[in-house]
């Protein structure tokens, strides 16, 4: 009689976290400050060939999205193509700062980024 035991160093069901080869300069702890003038930024995932939008929140409230590859928030646009995520943020002409949080998913791997745009200079 013999007994065999198997042990895995990777727990079953846990995916590798998403890793990024390209991120915008200024990204700190998942948050990016954006000037009132707006702009665009690019993220490139190096360990997943594709991923999709899991959720979008504006000022803490979930927004309804019908596409997993593109989201138009009116003052910002999120586009995913293959392993790249592009964010375009329009000029803020209001006297209030604004923000949105984007959660992306690749199977059981998730990542979240918050974008905070400055108010227009009066």
Enumerate the language-model features and the residues they cover.
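Generic structural detector for well-ordered beta-strands
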Residues: 33, 44, 86-88, 103, ...
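Surface-exposed binding patches on compact interaction domains or structured appendages
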Residues: 20, 31, 38-86
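A mature extracytoplasmic/lumenal domain signature
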Residues: 47, 91-93, 106, 119
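Bacterial Sec-dependent N-terminal signal peptides
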Residues: 1-27
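C-terminal edge beta-strand
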Residues: 17-20, 84-85, 108-122
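A short beta-strand micro-motif common to beta-rich folds, especially ectodomain repeats
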Residues: 94-108
């Amino acid at each position: 009689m013999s007994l065999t035991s198997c042990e895995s160093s990777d727990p079953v069901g846990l995916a590798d976290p998403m890793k990024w080869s390209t991120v915008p300069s200024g990204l700190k702890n998942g948050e990016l400050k954006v000037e009132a003038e707006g702009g665009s930024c690019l993220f490139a995932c190096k360990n997943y060939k594709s991923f999709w939008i899991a959720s979008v929140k504006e000022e803490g409230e979930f927004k309804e999205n019908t596409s997993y590859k593109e989201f138009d928030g009116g003052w910002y646009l999120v586009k995913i193509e293959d392993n790249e995520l592009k964010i375009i943020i329009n000029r803020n002409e209001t006297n209030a700062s604004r923000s949105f949080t984007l959660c992306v998913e690749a199977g059981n791997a998730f990542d979240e980024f918050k974008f905070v745009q400055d108010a227009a200079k009066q």
